[in-house]
Amino acid sequence: MSLEVNVTKRFDGFTLHAAFTAGDTATALLGASGCGKSMTLRCIAGIVRPDEGRIVLDGRVLFDRAQGIDLPPQQRNVGLLFQNYALFPNMTVEQNILCALKKEKDPAARRAACAEALRAMRLEELAKRLPGALSGGQQQRAALARILAAKPRILMLDEPFSALDSYLREEVEGEVGSLLAGFAGTALLVTHNRDEAYRLCREMIVMDSGEVLRAGTTKEVFANPRTRAAARLTGCKNILPCTRVGEHTVHLAGWEQPLTVALPVPEGCRAVGIRAHDFAPCAPGTPNSLPVQAVSTSENPFDWNMIFTLPGGETRLWWKVSKETLAAPPPKAPACLAAAPENIMPLV
């Protein structure tokens, strides 16, 4: 199963150009609010018509502007979970699911498919309840049951945890993770949360300002985001201006000692990224080290966040260290931090 998307949609002051492919695995669309992630899902679902381009699912053309093809949503066999779940408020959970099975003309087959969806989402005891009588997590399961009952060829989840209280998210995330892992087809997860994307999806597409910045396996994208914007969106706080010296060497602005980089440094490299947990205290003069001055320390439940400045005082560095490694902040903060070559990411 495969999805091919190459579409353009223009609005006043904003243009979406989404071009990517996705296979039969869970793929995250990661980006800040307003970057075009949700609009991309709506184009795929047929809710929004692109101005240009083409969408193909398993060799079947869903949209092709040049050929005049634009299948209506009900013919695309696409399941889209909206942020607010879009359950019919005056219908029970069971009735909501049966609405998705209108194409099935055999009443017995409809009832059987509905019962299967209720069992799959553990909703048997809630079948006769209205959506307003359900918790946020139960409403989400009901919406997913309605989608899955129709057996879509692609499952799309638009910020599925945004409407949930924080204490529910971990439980619901586990359920969604199991669903994505067991879904036999293409699944797209829209999120602005890099941790959710990393935990739930094997593939990742990073979007910014209507454009795809980076695509690949989730681990590849985190290890080598390639651009400063993609690095920030994947959570890298330390993005340091530099100049390219050689294929594996850069100079940081205002610091004479070169840094060795394991990844090839592209010609257009203008910065390096170092994730906060990839620093380690070191002695002055250690290769790939930076002299630092402590600014502040803050405590989280399981780790410490320390902020330093580089010489000159304008550039800040974030260092995150687990409490298993460091039970308490040292009386004297380290004067030097180092990063291994494999943990330095060249960025354009």
Residue ranges and their predicted role:
Residues 223-246, 273:
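C-terminal boundary and immediately downstream tail of ABC-type ATPase nucleotide-binding domains
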Residues 47, 78, 82-88, 193:
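Catalytic "switch" loops of ABC-type ATPases
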Residues 48-49, 56, 102, 181:
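A position-specific signal in ABC ATPase nucleotide-binding domains
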Residues 77, 92-229:
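ABC ATPase nucleotide-binding domains
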Residues 38-41, 141-142:
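ABC ATPase nucleotide-binding domain helices that frame the ATP-binding cleft
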Residues 54-76:
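ABC ATPase NBD Q-loop/coupling interface
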Residues 42-43, 203:
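The short alpha-helix immediately C-terminal to the Walker A/P-loop
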Residues 5-26, 30-32, 38-39, 46-49, ...:
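Non-catalytic connector elements of ABC transporters
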